[in-house]
């Protein structure tokens, strides 16, 4: 029994280490970036939201994209994704939705703990945090007044919901997140919603027909694209050193589509 416990403990430690080190490549890319990154504290009500901001190196004022992170929290990949948005010419603002007194994503001991905490976040709190980020964006001197939202995984679902919450958005980019459940979830959407989905992500893919129906019935613009052979999380997985060919192709193709859509802001 002692040997079995030891082996189990080693396996858990190895898994935890793998999880911790899995985004070292993203951290390394971010550290090489020439762009300006900064942390700001966004205060609203009794909350202070730790927020990561990246600025593009451009001559003119730029649109702002609010980034809603995955269910794992504000990871190195999420920060690197924000930097990539800035490289494309956009100001990226990423609130750490796990912010709490004395805590943020980095405070959680492992991925499972972060997932559990995020899953318990009230939608009203999430939208209030995003509102604080949107208000901050509106005050930024280098911003041109155009605001969009994007989200990934859990954040993709929240991006869809935030489009219904904030009528000032110019666009919403939903990456493999669940869609609306009822008609009331889309009635206030005033911007186009663009979806990015993996063919091998049946859990989310199964929701697309219902989302299409709800959006069409409400007269809203919803344009989903499904990427062949890609799984859930392909924007992150497709950029990793060990990316599968399908995820890598989906990542690259989605980025090209996304950049073309961003130019409409």
What is each model feature region?
Residues 30-33, 39-138, 236-240:
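Serine-hydrolase catalytic machinery in alpha/beta-hydrolase-like enzymes
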Residues 141-152:
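Alpha/beta-hydrolase fold nucleophile elbow
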Residues 151-155, 159:
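Gly/Ala-rich beta-loop-alpha elbow adjacent to hydrolase catalytic centers
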Residues 168-178:
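A conserved short beta-strand
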Residues 200-205, 232:
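Acidic catalytic loop of the alpha/beta-hydrolase fold
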Residues 4-42, 49-52, 154:
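An N-terminal hydrophobic leader/cap segment in hydrolases
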Residues 189, 195-197:
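Short beta-strand/loop motif that positions the catalytic acidic residue
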Residues 216, 221-265:
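C-terminal catalytic histidine-bearing segment of alpha/beta-hydrolase fold enzymes
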